[in-house]
Amino acid sequence: MSPRPEIKAGVGFKAGVKDYRLTYYTPDYQTKDTDILAAFRMTPQPGVPAEECGAAVAAESSTGTWTTVWTDGLTSLDRYKGRCYAIEPVAGEENQYIAYVAYPLDLFEEGSVTNLFTSIVGNVFGFKALRALRLEDLRIPPAYSKTFQGPPHGIQVERDKLNKYGRPLLGCTIKPKLGLSAKNYGRAVYECLRGGLDFTKDDENVNSQPFMRWRDRFLFCAEAIYKSQGETGEIKGHYLNATAGTCEEMIKRAQFARELGMPIVMHDYLTGGFTANTSLAHYCRDNGLLLHIHRAMHAVLDRQKNHGMHFRVLAKALRLSGGDHIHSGTVVGKLEGERQVTLGFVDLLRDDYIEKDRSRGIYFTQDWVSLPGVLPVASGGIHVWHMPALTEIFGDDSVLQFGGGTLGHPWGNAPGAVANRVALEACVQARNEGRDLAREGNEIIREAAKWSPELAAACEVWKEIKFEFDTVDTL
């Protein structure tokens, strides 16, 4: 029997485990214009250095693994690895740090939010050396954003399609969200649109349930839209929720909406998934449909201050994946949203170029180049008394959506819509005349209520309604 040959390790390979920071913590690194940059809020386990944690985040979300492997020598890790290039303590928080990580562009598939998130917010969030990890912000370079279609149409094209300018758009979510028959649902849509709203909306829960199948809902809503358009002379729409159990079924529903001549469909982009959402966005551009996006499930990901990801990251991801509207909080209503933070990601949705501004939670300057903008939708616990503040906070390029604030009117749905339209027109006129909506808002609403009995009734019903809780999402 011949002697067993001696196997020698290669010169460049040394088996074993080594600290991540030896390879992935590079404080001298100069970021490139093509790098994707990430800001992570880290809470290390006791005794683990911040530099090791930051390097671990960079490693585990790019080329690293827990031990040295032979195949490291078959590629250029220096070209492909993520790099933790800066770490700073979080003011006022014990044992929390912001780690800045740069990723080379070649790590990510073009035009795929799914692939981007699989790397950056993947397994690393379960890493044992970290007690908690939150992705606060991403810088998407133009070299990557140009590989995405983005929103199907964008703000200006939507205004041109609707022939509506110089004011926020008005919407209403049909309530109760579940349980109505298709015919009664269509009746509520008609009454709201006839009263002066621009849009009505399927609730995010409404897909195709036994009490109301999707095709029946689409047909009765189409009838309501055509009837209200004929009576008002305005273009109307209803967000027909195309979200379904499969991508094929989702596209089938969008096709039916197009065949009915409807202007807009809707998708729950987080529960539906980014691959489905991007597919629907491409279909909508090709077929002239606007796309309304609901963010159901977002608070599971973004509500905790030290773990998960901030909504500004989800907002940027949506702009890449595609959507013409997205729910963004209200600042003044029943749902979470601190003013400066909300306005920060609203600008990230709408504007082409947004400067770094840590006072608004914006960690990086973001240049979207020519990617179309997204209209923020303020929705949740708002009513006519909020109209001056909403108009002042969100400006013209927004959708103000009153569900209970329309359908809860004591005289019915159409008077509720009238009250909201009158309040909005009064606020826009007052603003255009140079009045201060923040200071004179209540007076402006009272003046308008003198000649609108519908608005006067709404003011009386909701005069005591407030949602006074401290926001969790603070800087």
Swiss-Prot record:
Naturally occurring in which organism (per UniProt) = Physcomitrium patens
Looking at the UniProt record, the site noted as Transition state stabilizer sits at: 334
Q: What is this protein called?
A: Ribulose bisphosphate carboxylase large chain
- Report the NCBIfam families cross-referenced here: PRK04208.1 (NF003252)
Q: Which GO terms describe its cellular component?
A: chloroplast
- Indicate the residues that form the catalytic site: 175, 294
Cofactor, free-text remark? Binds 1 Mg(2+) ion per subunit.
Catalytic function, reaction form = 2 (2R)-3-phosphoglycerate + 2 H(+) = D-ribulose 1,5-bisphosphate + CO2 + H2O; D-ribulose 1,5-bisphosphate + O2 = 2-phosphoglycolate + (2R)-3-phosphoglycerate + 2 H(+)
GO MF annotation terms: magnesium ion binding; monooxygenase activity; ribulose-bisphosphate carboxylase activity
Record note on quaternary structure: Heterohexadecamer of 8 large chains and 8 small chains; disulfide-linked. The disulfide link is formed within the large subunit homodimers.
Give me the residues of the propeptide, which is removed upon maturation. Answer: 1-2
